[in-house]
Amino acid sequence: MDKHVILRNEEERDWPAVERLTRRAFYNQYVPGCVEHYLAKRLRSHPDFIPELDLVLELEGQVIANVMYTKNRLVDEGGEEREILTFGPLCVAPEHQRKGYGRLLLEGSFQRAAGLGCDTVVIFGDPANYVSRGFKSGCPARRPLRSSARPSSRRGPAG
């Protein structure tokens, strides 16, 4: 990994590059095409978006990775609520994947989240990509989500 990597907050001037990067990173990964670049564009104006945790990784003046966070809440069976964070999309330019940049971005974002007083992050993602960072699968039985429980950008109990 190059030593000249900068972790910083995304700026408005980065928006087009981040959206192109996100499209390239996700295109045809899970379904034909992708929607993650559109999600990135929409998240910036969502009330749960956390600008302090909208981060880019820059290498030699080029944005090569990005992560965005939103506020959310987790509600258990007894109705007890806990404020949490969710992140995504998290992406690394295809030519820079599997070189440690995603880990650097994720760990830097966790440090900043902790600095804001946040201690819980819940995501929808491929467990193989995140278990090495301490994440555990919340659905070990691999039960499918109810159609009404699909992830969305609005607040609500986890399904």
Report the location of each language-model feature.
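Conserved N-terminal entry element of GNAT/NAT acetyltransferase domains
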Residues: 1-13, 20
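A short, polar/charged loop-to-alpha-helix boundary motif
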Residues: 73-82
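Active-site rim helix/loop that mediates acceptor-substrate recognition in acyltransferases
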Residues: 19, 23-68, 73-74
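NAD(P)-dependent dehydrogenase/reductase Rossmann-like domain
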Residues: 60, 149-159
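Conserved active-site alpha-helix within GNAT-family acetyltransferase domains
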Residues: 115-121, 125-149
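Conserved acetyl-CoA pyrophosphate-binding loop and the N-cap/start of the following alpha-helix
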Residues: 96, 100-108, 118
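A short, internal acetyl-CoA/4′-phosphopantetheine-binding micro-motif in the GNAT/acyltransferase core
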Residues: 89-97
